[in-house]
């Protein structure tokens, strides 16, 4: 989703209005880089006002001549229609029945390359490709063919495209209004490597002779050369330098997130200067690295909860007053603001309040495909929600992820997005005070799903050996049950926290979480925590003697 450019923000501010753009983060793990041989990828869809169900496209057969209407994924604007494929596959969320998974982040790039007359936007490319592809390579072919045939009506995009055996990163841009074409390049991520992208083009130079691991448009270089954007030899061509050269915002708000994600598993300190964005001569960071340990699903979930902890970019250490009294690792937006005519900015971490949904997709080649693909899904900021398991063969959605009559402006306690958001929005301003309670429940749920996974899948395989549909039905029921249990637990959590932290106090509980009472049946005396010491010192430094209690003479 769309990258925030500093120049764009300044231009919009001068016009007197500000529109907050979208932004996302992706993390990718090759099968030899994971603890169990899974290919994994993650995606957080971050956009203010975004409300997203767990989408579902049932498998289907289509008659010759049947057409599919294309609506823009961001705006819901009608673009046109394309012929349906003879057969389409089951899709739940961003994974299909063959375990193919696609995510994205938008970097924008050169505005003149957008084809406003094209039919296919980036979101439509994703979901049409999922319905038509059995492998990542096939998805790349479907997406690029659609863009070239019907036109690409979006800005520059980075796609994560994975299956149980391979992980790919592809970048695409249109060729301008009326072009009905796209330039693109796709690279296979080494099996032993990890990769990340976050709204800044990441592909630089690539080996055009490596036909096994590199795919690209025939005119990927010549098109840039024809526009005067590149003048060197083909071997020296850099995608991002030609089509989306990194600027300060692209590095500090976007590449810094990719830097932080990779930093969980590899020493990225040599590239800190690049992430900080201020030194034009800083060393660019690699597209992928080999991790210093094998990566698990739980690890990837934690990556998506990152706030630059333990790094110079941290927004979680209370080192400035931006986080408020209780050290909230979130900041208000827009990212840029002015004081006395000077431009300032907030950090933009991976975990952010405007997340509509987030997933970690786990794809495994050694299991029957109906069992091998697990789409770990959460309907809010990853830090503030538990990821429930959704199997790729699922054909029935939990009510909490598909609640009738509920959307971005209609609330329901039956809906996961709204229940998670009402809880997280209560916690944000009192983060250090309240978050430990939320985290305890979140981690308990996450760990319970991991603990149950082997047993659930063993039973599913036993059923599969007798009747594959019985296994699918079982996994459907399990996925629905866990999602609905999560919703019930989160509603309980919200009610508990309203009582426990009412009026900025803490009501005492016993080891079982039951509120203590006096011998006479009243609530026990609450604790009044006051200011955290760090904030109290900041307040005194800022206010001087204003609140100093005078010493009284005895």
What are the residue ranges of the model-derived segments?
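Hydrophobic core
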Residues: 10-17
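Histidine-centered catalytic/metal-binding microenvironments
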Residues: 443-554
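Substrate-recognition/cap regions that form aromatic- and gly/pro-loop-enriched pockets
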Residues: 325-463
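Glycine-rich, aromatic-lined ligand/substrate-binding cores of catalytic
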Residues: 225-374, 378
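A contiguous strand-loop segment
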Residues: 24-122, 142-295
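Sec/Tat signal peptide C-region and signal peptidase I cleavage site
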Residues: 17-23
């Amino acid at each position: 989703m769309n990258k925030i450019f500093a120049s764009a923000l300044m231009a919009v501010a001068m016009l007197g209005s500000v529109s907050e753009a979208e932004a996302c983060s992706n993390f990718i793990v090759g099968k030899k880089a994971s603890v169990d041989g899974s290919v994994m990828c993650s995606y957080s869809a971050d956009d203010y006002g975004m409300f997203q169900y767990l989408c579902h496209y049932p498998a289907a057969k289509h008659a010759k001549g049947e057409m599919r209407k294309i609506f823009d994924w961001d705006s819901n604007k009608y673009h046109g229609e394309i012929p349906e494929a003879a057969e389409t596959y089951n899709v739940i969320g961003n994974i299909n029945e063959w375990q193919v998974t696609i995510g994205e982040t938008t970097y924008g790039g050169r505005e003149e390359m957008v084809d406003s007359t094209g039919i296919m936007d980036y979101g439509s490319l994703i979901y049409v490709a999922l319905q038509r592809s059995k492998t990542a390579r096939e998805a790349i072919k479907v997406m690029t063919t659609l863009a070239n045939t019907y036109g690409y009506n979006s800005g520059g995009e980075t796609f994560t495209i994975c299956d149980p055996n391979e992980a790919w990163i592809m970048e695409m841009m249109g060729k301008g209004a009326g072009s009905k074409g796209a330039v693109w390049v796709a690279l296979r991520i080494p099996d032993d490597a990890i990769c990340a992208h976050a709204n800044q083009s990441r592909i630089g130079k690539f080996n055009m002779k490596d036909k096994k691991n590199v795919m690209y448009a025939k005119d990927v270089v010549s098109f840039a050369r024809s526009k005067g954007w590149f003048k060197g030899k083909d071997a020296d061509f850099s995608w991002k330098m030609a089509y989306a050269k990194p600027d300060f915002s692209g590095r500090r708000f976007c590449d810094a997130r990719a830097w932080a994600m990779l930093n969980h598993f590899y020493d990225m300190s040599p590239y800190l200067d690049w992430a900080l964005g201020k030194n034009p001569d800083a060393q660019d960071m690699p597209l992928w690295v080999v991790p210093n340990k094998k990566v698990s699903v739980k690890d990837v979930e934690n990556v998506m909860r990152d706030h630059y902890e333990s790094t110079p970019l941290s927004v979680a250490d209370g080192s400035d007053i931006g986080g408020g009294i209780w050290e909230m690792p979130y900041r208000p937006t827009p990212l840029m603001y002015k004081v006395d005519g000077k431009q300032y900015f907030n950090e933009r971490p991976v975990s952010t309040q405007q997340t509509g949904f987030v997933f970690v997709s786990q794809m495994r080649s050694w299991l029957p495909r109906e069992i091998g693909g697990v789409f770990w899904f959460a309907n809010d900021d990853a830090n503030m929600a538990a990821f429930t398991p959704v199997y790729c063969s699922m054909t029935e959605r939990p009510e909490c992820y598909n609640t009738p009559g509920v959307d971005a402006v209609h609330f329901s306690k039956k809906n996961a997005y709204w229940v998670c958001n009402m809880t997280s929005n209560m916690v944000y301003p009192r983060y250090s005070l309240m978050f430990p309670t939320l985290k305890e429940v979140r981690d308990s749920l996450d760990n319970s799903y991991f603990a149950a996974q082997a047993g659930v899948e063993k039973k599913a395989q036993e059923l599969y050996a007798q009747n594959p549909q019985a296994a699918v039905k079982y996994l459907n029921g399990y996925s629905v049950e866990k999602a609905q249990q999560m919703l019930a637990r989160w509603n309980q959590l919200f009610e508990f926290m309203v009582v426990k932290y009412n009026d900025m106090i803490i009501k005492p509980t016993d080891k079982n979480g039951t509120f203590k009472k006096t011998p006479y049946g009243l609530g026990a005396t609450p604790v009044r925590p006051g200011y955290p010491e760090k904030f109290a010192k900041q307040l005194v430094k800022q206010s001087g003697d204003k609140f100093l209690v005078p010493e009284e003479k005895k």
